[in-house]
Amino acid sequence: MRRSGDWVAGVFRPPWWEALGATLLFALAAFAWVVWLGGLSVGWDTLNHHVYLGWMAVEGGRLNQDVFAAGSMSCQYPYAYGPLYWLQAHGATGVQAALVLALPAVGAAPAVWLIAWSLFPRRGGTAGLVRFAWAALAFLSPLWWSLLDSTSNDIASSLPMIWAFALVLWRGACDLEARECDPGGAAVLQGSGPWMAAAGAMVALALAVKISQAFAALGVLVVAVATAPRWSTIGLRVLAFGAGGVAAALLVWWPWAKQTWESCGSPIYPMLADQLRPWVGHLP
């Protein structure tokens, strides 16, 4: 068993310079890719509702003025499309818009690296190369590269979800190492609460942007429970996770969901519309 002060220099203190280096390399690759492609590709979804939703995000909701201007997609959470509309309104070129919209993909790089660090928290050149290889492998998915030149909100919704996974896994590694190397590390164990709350908030943000992230949200919760160092800490983790999620949902999602419920009959329209319409007293 190591001394109580030795483990502080372990998994608790990731070499962020290494994460920064990996992020810069991934950023260069992503930006070079969108420049080589020649900018954004404009598909049917872009013309049907992406620009319209971005307009609502920037100029204000229009659910009480327009009658399903983009069909059922008119009720989709619009704020992830705000940058797209703003760039278009200010005359950005296709390449400039693609570079800006690729930023969430770049922001996922340090989160993926943190996941690799949590699983392999060793220092040294060889360990760093192993983590970089793991992170690079994660970004080799053709789907990820295909989304870089699109206006889809998939990457924007995936960014907070990936960070939620990273924070939960990292704090789980911290707590497990604290229990193993320093039985008196109660302060460290108690310090995971804010991180679990932050992870819950990020999950709520991802769900607000794209409800199909629900399955990934369950995965984050499973990781949070599975990495708890003691049975007694599971309840605290779940409570902090839920509190962070509810707070973020009330702040970020509920104002728009309330408008959607009142105008379209469901806060997650078109799902549950028939069941929830009677609660607002009219059939839109």
Locations of the language-model features?
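Perimembrane helix-loop-helix junctions
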Residues: 2-8, 182-186, 216-249
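Transmembrane signal-anchor helices characteristic of membrane glycosylation enzymes that use polyprenol
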Residues: 17-44, 140-142, 243-261
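Short hydrophobic/aromatic helix or loop-helix immediately within or flanking a transmembrane segment
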Residues: 51-57, 69-95, 99
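Multi-pass, polyprenyl lipid-linked donor-dependent membrane glycosyltransferases
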Residues: 75, 100-104, 123, 129-137, ...
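Transmembrane-helix motifs of polytopic, lipid-linked glycan transferases
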Residues: 86, 96-124, 163
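Specific aromatic-rich, kink-prone transmembrane helix
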Residues: 111-114, 136-146, 156-179, 184, ...
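Membrane-interface alpha helices of multi-pass inner-membrane proteins
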Residues: 188, 195-211, 217-222, 251, ...
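Membrane-lumen/periplasm interface segments of specific transmembrane helices
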Residues: 239-284
